[in-house]
Amino acid sequence: MILYVNCCARENSRTDILAREVIRRIGDSEVEEINLYEKNLKPMDRQSVAKRDSLAAAGNFSDPMFDYAKQFMASDTIVIGAPFWDYSFPSLLKTYIENVFCVGLISVYDENGVPHGTCKAKKLYYVSTAGGPFIPDYSYEWIRAVVTRSFGIPETKLIYAENLDIVGHNPDEILEKATASITL
């Protein structure tokens, strides 16, 4: 099963178009999409952190607050579609990762303090578009670090199109080239 984490706010989003092409090429017939803009995601606060920590310490992961983590863990492949805005991804993606990340469920630490992820996925695709230059250090690299170091996903792949809104550039042509260059 492919999990598509859709963090595209705009209708006809260029990032969404590119991400859906990646999903089509992967070819798995089962796709679960979570559109972050249609969910009531909230950043972790004092109460939610305390609740999560208490339940995790008791080994009780039946609360709905763990549903996003369970869905993420059970996926065979993950595709994240997130535009590059204001030198990063939309803050809603960070909020989603906060809601997914739970020590004891999605990641466990060994006696030396080394995290070991429990995710089933072997690969995560990070798909993005940018109106100007795309800077992976401020978006993809953070996601890559979290999922490889703490979630146990061994491979990530960046697919992006940049400079789509630069005067004199042809955004349709840029997107076509990015689509043609997709390798899985």
Where are these regions (language model features)?
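Short histidine/acidic/glycine/proline-rich micro-motifs that form metal-
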Residues: C8-N12, G131-F134, L164-I166
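Structured loop/turn residues at beta-strand edges in well-structured enzyme cores
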Residues: M73, S91, C119, F151-P154
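Residues at the starts of beta-strands that form the adenosine-phosphate
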Residues: M1, E30, K122-L124, E155
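Active-site donor-binding loop signature of nucleotide-sugar glycosyltransferases
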Residues: L36, T129, A161-N163
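Short, glycine-/small-residue-rich phosphate/pyrophosphate-handling segment
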Residues: Y109-F151
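Structural beta-sheet core signal
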Residues: Y4, I80, L124-Y126, L158
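N-terminal beta1-alpha1-beta2 submodule of the flavodoxin-like/Rossmannoid cofactor-binding fold
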Residues: M1-E98, C102, A180-L184
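Glycine-rich phosphate/pyrophosphate-binding loop and the adjoining helix
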Residues: D137, E141-L184
